[in-house]
């Protein structure tokens, strides 16, 4: 692990790589990086983890103040980098009494810590909305291993009339398209539920249990088969 400057090229490129493989993560241009550092103190550090081939595989942005390590962000491409960064934190044991920070992976940190005294809290932050269902679906990837599905979706949107419609959507070969071919199933949901589903925050099965989706349970199961289920990673502008 080596400490680098805020504008280090490898550090920025590592984040770009991470964003390219992580659902929901924003790419940061120079303006976004400027905003990222806007409220940070000058003593804030960046530590980059390098593997045996000297390739950067993870980083941590942190500040040590009043015997507390405040972790702003921890990013890693693999398990090796994750363990290396946690070992880096452990190396500061004599300098700190507590570690504070945020995680955006929706992962149970307490499970990783043996006999750790840890407090975790969940804070709602970002809110999403699909503005144009048809345009969104045109660029939306689906699971190519989920088979082929043609489903009639009845979307309710009281604010945007072009979304308030019923349409047949075909999921096949990793893509979804609007179609006029006969549908196998019918499901009904509001635009908020539709956004929650397609962004990966909740599965169709869970939304069905919460009575946010109307239709046959078999249709819900088939829809889950063709969708990816990854909770978005959103760490910017917090």
Question: How would you name each of these model-derived features?
Answer:
Residues 2-238:
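Intrinsically disordered, low-complexity, positively biased terminal segments
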């Amino acid at each position: 692990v080596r400490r680098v400057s805020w504008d280090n090229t490898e550090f920025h490129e590592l984040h770009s790589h991470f964003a390219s493989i992580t659902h929901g993560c924003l790419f940061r241009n120079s303006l976004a990086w400027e905003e990222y550092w806007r409220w940070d103190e000058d003593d804030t550090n960046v530590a980059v983890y390098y593997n045996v081939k000297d390739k950067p595989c993870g980083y941590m942005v942190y500040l040590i103040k009043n015997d507390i390590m405040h972790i702003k962000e921890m990013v890693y491409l693999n398990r090796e980098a994750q363990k290396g960064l946690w070992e880096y934190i452990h190396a500061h044991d004599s300098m700190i009494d507590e570690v504070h920070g945020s995680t955006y992976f929706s992962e149970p940190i307490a499970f990783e810590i043996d006999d750790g005294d840890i407090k975790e809290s969940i804070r709602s932050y970002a809110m999403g909305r699909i503005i144009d269902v048809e345009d969104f679906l045109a660029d939306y990837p689906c699971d190519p291993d989920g088979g082929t599905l043609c489903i009639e979706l009845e979307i309710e949107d009281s604010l945007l009339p072009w979304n308030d419609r019923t349409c047949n959507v075909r999921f096949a070969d990793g893509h979804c398209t609007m179609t006029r071919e006969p549908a196998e199933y019918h499901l009904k949901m509001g635009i908020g539920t539709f956004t929650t589903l397609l962004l990966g925050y909740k599965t169709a099965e869970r939304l069905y249990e919460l009575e946010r989706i109307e239709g046959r349970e078999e249709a819900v199961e088939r829809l889950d088969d063709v969708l990816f289920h990854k909770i978005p990673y959103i760490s910017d502008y917090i």
